Amino acid sequence: TIESNDKIVAFIDSLELPKILKNDSNINHTSSDGQKFNIKSSIDSTNAGFSFKYFGTAKGVSVYTFIDESHKLFYSTVINVSERESGYVIDGLMHNEVVKSDIHSTDTHGFSEVIFGLTHLLGFSFAPRIKNFKDQQLYGINSPKDYQNKGYILLPKRKINFEIIEENWDDILRFILTIKSRRTTASQLLKRLTSYSKHHKLYTAIKEFGKIIKTNFLLVYIDKVELRQRIEKQLNKSEASNRFAKAIFFGNNAEFIFASQEEQNIANNCKRLIQNAVILWNYLYID
């Protein structure tokens, strides 16, 4: 089903009409978002979790799906509802064969300082939608007092710890090369780093580097209304795609009936295949 999806996505990409939907013909803006689905009550799945907000007393999973400006669904995976979506952002950007992203957006659940650092080093511009901007922390090259003395209105919380970044720089580059090799996923590597009782020094160093990238993005984000509008527009496509997925995934009371993550991913990619086929049909019909 993954190969079939890739072929449809590649064919859509070869059409002229989808190119009209892009803001910039030289830049591909993508986004990702999670959608919750119930697991059938009689199914015992280790990949399912509880969330009263979404499932009440039942269990369910989260389907994390990637979409580009032309509405092509180029990657999707089923994850445990208790996991943070941000850990899977890089998986979709690196482990698909047909869509090259230049700018990637998520909602608040999809970003972290570590993801800011990793996406920058991998060559992607990470541009999430920021909720409660006033609660976000800025970081500076110098101490906060230096910026205060210069009369800056926006002040950093503290100075970046360049020492820990420099000490672990070689390991950071090795980590990036491992992700680029695609022998394993970034989500698996990050799980390993965060499994230690204390923060691993490599994880801490990547996070510290990410604070630099995040701070720069926040300053641009608050200054440029066009950027905020572009991010909102792209994330609206993710949310519209989720509603479309609900309409497609109507069998079995819109519940997953498989226990293993592998089977759940097969079912999910079949749903994605139908969605991509409908999108392709619409392009051909309009054209």
Language-model regions, residue ranges each:
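Short, basic alpha-helical nucleic acid-contact segments in DNA-binding proteins
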Residues: 2-19
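Acidic, metal-coordinating catalytic cores used for nucleic-acid/nucleotide bond scission
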Residues: 104-116, 132-137
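Active-site cores of enzymes that catalyze phosphoryl transfer or operate on phosphate-rich substrates
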Residues: 17-85, 89
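Long, compositionally biased intrinsically disordered regions
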Residues: 150, 157-287
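Short, conserved catalytic/metal-binding motifs centered on acidic residues
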Residues: 1, 30-36, 104-109
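Glycine- and acidic
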Residues: 1, 71-79, 98-102
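Helix-centered, glycine/charged polyanion-binding patches within enzymatic domains
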Residues: 125-163
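Short, basic/hydrophobic alpha-helical segments
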Residues: 85-103
